[in-house]
């Protein structure tokens, strides 16, 4: 399966050539904006994580591969950060099926009740 969205990171990081529009450049470029962008990538800052994290992910998501959600969850677990992961095998980027949406809302608001009071 292919999608134009596979090019979004390049657009977000340098594919835009409009004058005055800030973009960092491709991930492999060495321009200062691209280097700064990579230096601030969340995966390089895991050692600073201390906020509880709830990861919800649709396994059919082609925008954000499920492995990225799992990686964030695993990193939080390894750091001892309170964390929970909820996978939806039949959902994409958004959790839209009625039964899944109800489950998502219950989990989300329970999480807020637990950590935001």
Describe the function of each predicted region.
Residues 1-117:
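Active-site-proximal cap/loop segments of hydrolase catalytic domains
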């Amino acid at each position: 399966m292919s999608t134009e969205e596979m090019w979004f990171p390049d657009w977000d990081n340098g594919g835009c050539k409009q004058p005055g529009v800030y973009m960092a450049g491709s991930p492999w470029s060495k321009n200062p904006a691209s280097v700064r962008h990579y230096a601030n990538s969340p995966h390089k800052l895991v050692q600073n994580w201390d906020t509880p994290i709830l990861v919800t992910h649709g396994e059919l998501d082609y925008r954000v591969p499920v492995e990225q959600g799992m990686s964030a969850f695993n990193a939080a677990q390894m750091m001892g950060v309170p964390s929970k992961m909820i996978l939806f095998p039949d959902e994409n980027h958004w959790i839209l099926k009625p039964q899944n949406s109800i489950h998502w809302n219950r989990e989300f608001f329970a999480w807020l009740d637990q950590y935001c009071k």
